[in-house]
Amino acid sequence: MSIKKLILLALALPIHVHANIFFIKGNTVNDTDVDNAAIYFNAGIGPQTVAWLLSSIDEINGNYRNIQNIDIYLNSGGGDMDSGYMAYEALRKSPTKLNMINASNVASSATIIYCASNQRYAMPMASFLLHPAAAANEINDYLKPDQAQRILDDAEKYNSLFRTIYSSCTKIPAEELKAITSSESRRAIYNIENAKKVGLVNQDIKQPATYPVTYYITDMQN
């Protein structure tokens, strides 16, 4: 797209910016006519990005009383497990139907957010990564036995969380989930066909769509 076309697009559509959230709404669209919206989440999972995601959904629900569906396009390599779980619990209780779409890569703690919806799509070349959680070693020194055990206990807490959520949104056997979350060498990488076989993707390939309201979330630093 040429610079001239980009300038014309900017003039035609109002672009609003809040922190690392950009949203576009057509000039001719009335708030009461909006029944479908999209959020493109292209970021790691952390306290700030999850807050942006949840606040964007709240803003859509608050501004557009006739909203029926929100399509959430995820591209995330994962990040903080606690933030991912908080988002999972908030999203799965959403009064508005949320459709999760793997837009390219959904990995690690981002898979928790993906599993928050019963409507799970993917783009044709998208992939998933399921693997063990990692616990931080805040003591950058030699570890005593009890300190090492605490790190292992923290990791197992998050791996148990992975298994519990995966057992609710996939058909992966319990023994296989145990293996996946026990060793990085047993990590599972799924393309869309294999993700469908295990139930992680339970809808068809997502077709291109246009939306009257679109939000973009990124953790890119300006």
Task: Kindly give the residue locations of the regions a language model identified.
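N-terminal organellar transit peptides
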Residues: 1-107, 116-222
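Thiamine diphosphate
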Residues: 110
